[in-house]
């Protein structure tokens, strides 16, 4: 009772301490500033953007970051109140120059900072607008001399001292008004100035080479004042009227994984309206609240039915109220409806209750499947009252010892199976008569629950899966792999003895997330993704084209952000680029856990809303509960929000609902530009088993048109619908003919779907070869073709063609294609191809001893489960002897073991931190290449082991050992004591 009274007190304090009045005037908006940076570590504009964004955010200023000068166009610039430049772009195109100059002349703000005075050197007018150009510099620590202390920009700014580059300018305009100078002897160098340009205002400062200036409070104050001064009067007037929430803070017992000297305070929760005022979304979008407490509580998963109604999974039992009797839980499945069309839910129906920590929901067979470890449960309403009448177990065997590592992200796939992910709690059970056991990764199963496959293993806890419109599969994992690609499912790799971990490739191209709050609390992968969840692409057409089938939404609740992961083709696979944020909040309770395209084409965000996000490892001074999460009475059990992010210029979706008894309605669903409706229509047709709709499916498949992306999505879904109806099993000649003809479709995605749905027979092999898909110009479709060939009847005559194709550079040098050809050759020439996997590892960096060398000692080290510590803090060995160190990873995430030179732990640790932010860091096992690293294992997966055999250094002393996985080394370390 005391803990709930404490929470109530916190909430009351938050209400009383708020200096806030809600103004429902849309004109009162946050200032929107576009920051143009560049891709360079010198003058690191990305880091500059993060610092400035965090400093200005709670004052109502949004920073949108780009490195692309092509964003200097009339349409894009018009969205912003001001443009800040911190970059070294040598040249500017005529169209970009015209757009930039006209933008400022029209009355918008311009804020060039530091190196911006040496940007666009081919534009004299740009230099004139800035007010001067960089000429040369030295470096040093110097003080700002304030020239005009009465100017609004200098209000509250003290004369500050900082280390920076000592800029000297040339081509200084006559109309600048100097605010600060850098004085060196008799020389007074203008260092901060303002000027007018047309109707616009320009603020320039030469300060800002690196963090020594960026983090100076007076520099930041001057820069923020400069931003506010530079925007036009209308924008500033609206901004001045903007409510700026000031949440209350109180002392509380909170984990301090980062070991910050100042620790943390507990922010009081905000109302949904207040929280929105501390949120940032793209400038041409609006944030709408669909539902919040008390109508909903702790939503953890969502899905929509064929009527476009939102269903959510609520769990107040999560994470530690694990009940022995699962039918006695407090968790519910709830339907949320907007009955009057105002965009907000006004009807809430409990479909089923008494669940205990359900974690996902999807629709199948006229009902829903709920993930509630250890079971998958099928629920169905049989009398139309929106209450579950049928409740039966579908699959049993999901691990229960850790509630944030169980099954999640259930989705109906194009192949008419249910897909999902699971964390390290894994699965161990019987499906039909097949005994299955697997750990973290991705799986699929039939909607009936009678068949299941493990498709790919991941490196750590996993809570996210998504499909592209061309049926590519992407995954997010919690720790340092927020974007991954399922390249070749494990059943294929198994044929050549490859491990399940090689099915999935880490493709994320960056480490950092970009937060707008300074109060970041993470256990590891600091400032990176340590709790990533979800990986849903934008698969509708209501948003601008740059989003279509290209930008995936990855949630990071510890960072309070929804990340934009830009997915681009790379050979037969993909790579991810940093798209910054789709949504970010300075409300320290905002906890996005699922972000997905809804029936209306908007993006819906499920906000778990909780100050405490971290599950484990157990912080000092705390204990774990039954769900393996550390016990903290501050874990919230009452809040929850659902938002919609709507594009302001979007057109309304034509489809509002589908009628499963109306074939015309279902065909319209397949023709929708929203993948939700296409998938829902496909599911309903397959579930109906109505083959009378087949001719209409043929018509969709035979349509040769493609959209702006080269996709014909209706044809793709129509092909998979045929497969789901069972007409492509080899006995329906017309269906086979239509699908085979689609092998020549202009859309690569249609060709891929066609070859995948064809039956596994000789006729399909002949059709695929005739269409030339083994040499398809689209490498992703080519990959699917080669994998399909590996399943088809053995054809010795195909061997020479496979061998010739395998040698082509685009196949040989492609990770996935080279493996696929090996699999296909193994199938068609099984005796002469030796591709058995050799998974025994020799630890690189170790001193390899002859087999006859006597091992003086064997040391076995393991991590302590969930503690991020080794179970052996020290061990002792004799100098010059040969020893073996066996590292057994019994934890649930990757770890390694590095033995270092004496006194080098901090140096190597710092190098490991830097390597963690390198896109190639994972490929290097996060092991810095430096002489201080004496011996090391690779990254060892859960349940794996690796042995180091080496000769102990001759010099006695203390040799540290660490785990160099991002963020671990400060906690996970020990000492090898070498004695004479």
Regions found by a protein language model. Give the residues of each.
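Catalytic beta-strand/loop cores that center a nucleophilic Ser/Cys/Thr
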Residues: 132-206
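A glycine-rich, often tryptophan-bearing local segment used as a flexible ligand/cofactor-contacting loop or short
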Residues: 36, 90-156
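Extracellular ligand-binding/catalytic regions of CAZymes and related secreted enzymes
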Residues: 27-31, 58, 197-262
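Beta-propeller domains with acidic blade repeats across secreted/periplasmic ectodomains
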Residues: 32, 55, 62, 66, ...
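N-terminal edge beta-strand
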Residues: 853-882
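Extracellular/periplasmic metallocenter environments
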Residues: 931-980
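Beta-strand cores of secreted/periplasmic/IMS beta-sandwich domains, seen most often
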Residues: 309, 466, 874-899, 946-960, ...
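Extracellular/periplasmic ectodomains of large secreted or surface enzymes and adhesion receptors
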Residues: 244-289, 496-516, 523, 580, ...
